[in-house]
Amino acid sequence: MLFRSEPGEFLLGQAYKNQYDGNFLGDIPPELGNNASYGAFRILQQDVASFETLLDTTSQRFGLDRELVAAKLMGRWRNGVPLTLSPDTPDYKLSEGQINAFDYADSPSNPTYYDDHTGLRCPIGSHIRRMNPRSGMVMGQPYSRRLIRRAMPYGPEYRHGHDDPTVERGLIGYFICGDLEMQYEFMVGTWGNLDYSQAGIRGTRDPIFGAQPEQQGRFVIRINDTRDPIVLSDLPRWVTTRGSVYCLLPGIGGLRYLA
């Protein structure tokens, strides 16, 4: 199952069921705004050494494979295979088109999906599940918050136990959408850093990029239906914004208008 996106999720002036009930350009002249996009350009420093160290300590403390801990925090294995399709191993053959074709619950149209409403396979608080609940409702409405991400790492690749952990490294790139406030800012602010009412993740933030309180971030991992959940209660902040600018990315017509 692939989730269909409306053109207006990424292109201004195109159809999109949002809070404006359709096409929306704001105060931008249509000659400039039609088929343009907004882009949040971000420089995100990542504390990779701290992340890898937490995997070590959590693995030793709870007897879990460190790569499974990493996958639970993210919602995917490092090779991109989602936990909801392969909860026990990253060695799961998927085509490029299948790697994002999944949901967290079954439905009449997709009865074969595993019903993971409790987060047994993919934790409810994991990064990819918080940032894209897929068929789940948003504030009671099926509004999408999808983004187009175009980014690249900066700094040297980190080799755990061999490299200087103080060397700065991270991610630099664009998060592209048709509505910065209701898509990008909503995802980062509400889904990423505000409290959810759902059981098991109350009082938590996104484990990967959330602005955690000082060494007090909390994350819940369910192993099975008989074992008590594992609670990580000392997550640090791993991602820090070093630079940010909101941009308008005109379409071809907009570039002609500016010329």
Where are these regions (language model features)?
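Long, histidine/aromatic-enriched segments associated with O2/redox biology
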Residues: 1-259
